[in-house]
Curated annotation (Swiss-Prot):
It is found in: Cytoplasm. PROSITE patterns: AA_TRNA_LIGASE_II_ALA. InterPro entries: aa-tRNA-synth_II/BPL/LPL, Ala-tRNA-lgiase_IIc, Ala-tRNA-ligase_IIc_anticod-bd, Ala-tRNA-synth_IIc_core, Ala-tRNA-synth_IIc_N, Ala-tRNA_ligase, Ala_tRNA_ligase_euk/bac, DHHA1_dom. Binds 1 zinc ion per subunit. Catalyzes the attachment of alanine to tRNA(Ala) in a two-step reaction: alanine is first activated by ATP to form Ala-AMP and then transferred to the acceptor end of tRNA(Ala). Also edits incorrectly charged Ser-tRNA(Ala) and Gly-tRNA(Ala) via its editing domain. Keywords: Aminoacyl-tRNA synthetase, ATP-binding, Cytoplasm, Ligase, Metal-binding, Nucleotide-binding, Protein biosynthesis, RNA-binding, tRNA-binding, Zinc. This is Alanine--tRNA ligase.
């Protein structure tokens, strides 16, 4: 077998399909762009949905890619099996309505078996097909020449995730030999496609030819597609003859580096240790790429997944004897392994290391955080007069802080509480069910819109240079059908040329009107989006008859566009100013450009201080007042990068790109509309800055007239406050507010003193009744206070004054009874425990409880039982 590196295999795959007329699509960011159904990009086809559901028509219907992907559905299996990974690469070739089975099947065989390419032994390959897919069966047998006994019909070979595109698929298996197997040769599962380790699936070709309708019916799609997927890690393990994916050049450098950081553990010596080595190597790849693509550790969403992976790796490091921070040291190794196709990892190495190191340091505090949450949970349960920690709370401790259920149960028992084990298991099962369903939910696709797909009109955008264009109306769509004319209602229009900007890149669509050549307004443009074939599709409210083929005048609202261009140019200035103040690690994470305000999301590890925010704002205004020219140039992507233009990692760029340059200060790739000069913006004012997720911040701002209005409104508000507070000038407001705060603090202090004095008077009355109970002095009383907090205060005073050996107090709040028991040290030594006593008397008030030997509490629902409970306490001690 050929000796090939993983980098060579990846490149050979792309080169093979490039020779077959495919465009090579660069690997997209792991963070989905404009796809709310996905947490992560989890397959090669996930980034191509817009082509397959017909929203966009690709320049070339033949596409190939090597797509980095993350799946965490089966995270508990990582390290325990030969092939489960959180991060992996999918090699894929795709046809959007072009070639089909007759080409896809022979090409797969050629790539795998040809000596020019991978050169696998054809005798070790088997395929599976859907029983009803006679075409695929025929092609494998007649065109490829595969023997019938190596074509296995499997009922599960039908790709269907609910509504949307679906179809039969064909899988290719490599026979690794019986020595790799985990079942006997005569086992019924010992066949390609069965549950065994001998036959390894290396390629899956999906023939997407049907559309699954909501009513369950399957109809043929207007355009049939090919969607293939081959895991790079699997294919490399076959080529490098590795026992599992982990013994390949994609993982072994990471495993070896981890072993070098362990005092005494080595890979291959102990099965349990090997699992930890594999988990660390796998998770190091996932977190490195995820952070590089803009994800940050957090307590929800993809940030939570990231945090869980880092902490899981750290815990496995501890099992290997690695107690210091180490995960961040694996980042450059990941970068070196993958640099031939993903050079950006090494370019961002310092930032990725910083994020992981920070998370490792933070994790040391996590167990303490977990303990604090557990204590708060226990206190809350007691305050509600309950005796059980619910399953959801126990699961949160496990899921967020890594607290094993056994540890939570142990702490609860010390406090006289129990844990809802059944509820915990229910939460665990629900999480696993969500994980199982995630793949099908995430991969859902919309159906193709044949009407829009069939619109082939060439449409030119003229809006960079003019706001009014005369153009021929080429297509009218109403009621999901092409029309020759339209007289009323809402319609969608395509013109041969238009000045209207279609929504893209965070910039909203233009608004305006359409006039006939007589000057009459015939429609109002309310929205503009791109049609599947790339034309601006105008959504309009029709006022007068419009006829296909007739010329009209399209006019963009100049006030609307004027506000948009100012705010869009401001986002470019803001982006560069943030980099100048916070550092080059800061990246744009999203934006919204409206005519009256702008929103800008960016990555940053910590909060932005008021001083930093003020500096950013000052820089932007300085550039506005410097009257810098705004120029644009079209060039190829490589030239743009050499010029130093900033590109967004979430964007995909074509061969020709537009560079927007603001003086010598800012240069970005951007297809939006902009001001001609920064002086057009007039003024820039940040209105808010906040965190919208771990490592992601959001700035909202206004420019020009909106900025003036914002500042003027603030002045009006200050004047109103000054009037209400009887202050002559607004500059004196801070001093007045400080005075009011000091006065309030003094009043609060006096109030607390009065409450304490009242509590002492109450305590004196409660503690007067000391009675003998056997050999012990007992205070047992209905304290008649507000609730459990007040009972605890009384118990604290009792402990300080050492009034008796045992204290039993009760009170009623509404229909709830609260009980507290406290025991002095000498009585505890003699065997009297607060937890035992509370368990005896709590049932008499219709409740239960528990606690420590020195203090316990309970709740109940039977106020009438208080006298019996107090009497029972005396009997218990007698």
């Amino acid at each position: 077998m050929k000796q090939l590196t993983s980098a060579q295999v990846r490149q050979m795959f792309l080169d093979f399909f490039k020779e077959k007329g495919h465009d090579v699509e660069p690997s997209a960011s792991l963070i989905p762009d404009e796809d709310p159904t996905l947490l992560w990009i989890n397959s090669g086809v996930a980034t191509l949905k817009k082509y397959f559901d017909g929203r966009v028509v690709p320049n070339n219907p033949r596409i190939t890619n090597a797509q980095k992907s993350i799946r965490t559905n089966d995270i508990e299996n990582v390290g325990k099996t030969a092939r489960h990974h959180t991060f992996f690469e999918m090699l894929g070739n795709f046809s959007v309505g072009d070639y089909f089975k007759e080409d896809a099947i022979p090409w797969a065989w050629e790539f795998l078996t040809s000596d020019k390419w991978i050169g696998l032994d054809p005798e070790k390959l088997y395929v599976t097909v859907y029983p009803k897919d006679k075409d695929a069966h025929r092609i494998w047998h007649e065109k490829v020449g595969l023997a019938e006994d190596r074509i296995i019909e499997v009922e599960d070979n039908f790709w269907d995730i609910g509504e949307g595109p679906c179809g039969p698929d064909s899988e290719i298996f490599y026979d690794r030999g019986q020595s790799f197997n985990n079942v006997s040769e005569d086992d019924p599962e010992n066949y390609p496609g069965g549950e065994n380790e001998r036959y390894l699936e290396v390629w899956n070709i999906v023939f997407s030819e049907f559309n699954h309708l909501p009513n369950g019916e399957y109809v043929e799609q207007p355009h049939k597609n090919i969607d293939t997927g081959m895991g790079l890690e699997r294919l490399v393990s076959v080529i490098q003859e590795a026992p599992t994916n982990f013994e390949t050049d994609l993982f072994m450098p990471l495993i070896e580096a981890t072993a070098a950081m362990s005092d005494h553990k080595q890979y291959g010596q102990n099965a349990a240790d090997d699992i930890s080595f594999k988990i660390i190597a796998d998770h190091a790849r996932a977190v490195t790429f995820a952070i590089g693509d803009g994800a940050m550790p957090a307590n929800e969403g993809r940030g939570y997944v990231l945090r869980r992976l880092i902490r899981r790796a750290i815990l496995n490091g501890k099992k290997l004897g690695i107690n210091d921070a180490f995960m961040y040291k694996l980042v450059p190794i990941v970068g070196e392994i993958m640099h031939s196709y993903y050079p950006d990892v090494l370019e961002q190495k310092d930032f990725i290391e910083k994020v992981i190191r920070s998370e490792e340091d933070r994790f040391r505090e996590t167990l303490n955080d977990g303990l604090r949450l557990l204590n708060q949970t226990i206190e809350a349960v007691k305050a509600e007069n309950e005796t059980e920690i619910n399953g959801a709370d126990a699961f949160k401790l496990f899921d967020t802080f890594g607290f094993p259920i056994e540890l939570t149960t142990e702490y609860a028992e010390d406090e006289g509480l129990t844990v809802d084990q059944a509820g915990f298991e229910k939460e665990m099962a629900a999480q696993k069910a969500r994980a199982r369903n995630a793949r099908s939910d995430e991969q859902s696709m919309g159906s193709q819109n044949e009407v829009l797909l069939n619109i082939k009109t060439k449409s030119e955008f003229t809006g960079y240079s003019e706001l009014e264009t005369e153009s021929r109306l080429a297509d009218i769509i109403q009621d999901n059908a092409e029309q020759e004319s339209v007289t009323t209602g809402v319609a969608q229009l395509v013109f041969e040329a238009t000045p209207f900007y279609a929504e893209m890149g965070g910039q909203v669509a233009d608004q305006g009107i359409i006039k006939n050549l007589a000057g009459q307004v015939v429609a109002e443009v309310t929205d503009v989006q791109y049609a599947p074939n790339g034309q601006p599709l105008h959504t309009v409210k029709v006022l007068k008859e419009m006829i296909s083929g007739v010329h009209y005048t399209l006019s963009v609202d100049p006030t609307f566009r004027g506000g948009v261009v100012k705010n869009h140019t401001a986002t470019h200035l803001l982006d560069q100013a943030l980099r100048d103040v916070l550092g080059e690690h800061t990246h744009q994470a999203g934006s919204l450009v409206e005519p009256d305000y702008l929103r800008f999301d960016f990555t940053n590890l910590g909060q932005v201080t008021p001083d930093q925010l003020a500096e950013v704002e000052q820089i932007v205004n300085d550039k506005i007042w410097a009257a810098l020219p705004v120029n644009t140039v079209e060039t190829d992507i490589e030239t743009a990068k050499q010029m130093g233009a900033i590109a967004l990692f979430t964007e995909k760029y074509g061969k020709t790109v537009r560079v927007v340059q603001i003086g010598d200060y800012s240069m970005e790739l951007c297809g939006g509309t902009h001001a001609n000069n920064t002086s057009d913006l007039g003024l820039f004012k940040i209105t808010s800055e906040s965190g919208i997720g771990a490592g992601t911040r959001r700035i909202e701002a206004v420019t020009s007239k909106a900025a003036f209005k914002y500042l003027n409104d603030k002045q009006v508000l200050l004047n109103e406050l000054a009037s209400e507070l009887k202050v002559a000038q607004t500059k004196d407001l801070p001093k007045k507010i400080q005075q009011l705060q000091a006065d309030l603090k003094a009043e609060q202090k006096e109030n607390e003193q009065l409450k304490a004095k009242f509590a002492q008077e109450q305590a004196g009355n409660v503690f007067e009744n000391v009675v003998e109970a056997g050999q012990w002095r007992l205070v047992a009383a209905d304290a008649k206070v507000a609730g459990m907090n007040e009972l605890r205060q009384l118990a604290d005073q009792w402990q300080q004054k050492q009034i008796s050996d045992v204290l039993v107090l009760a009170t009623v709040a509404g229909d709830k009874v609260s009980l507290i028991v406290a025991v002095a040290p000498d009585a505890i030594k003699a065997g009297i425990k607060a937890g035992d006593l509370i368990k005896q008397i709590a049932p008499l008030v219709g409740g239960g409880g528990g606690g420590r030997p020195d203090m316990a509490q309970a709740g109940g629902k039977n106020p009438a039982g208080i006298p019996d409970a107090l009497a029972a306490a005396k009997e218990f001690l007698a």
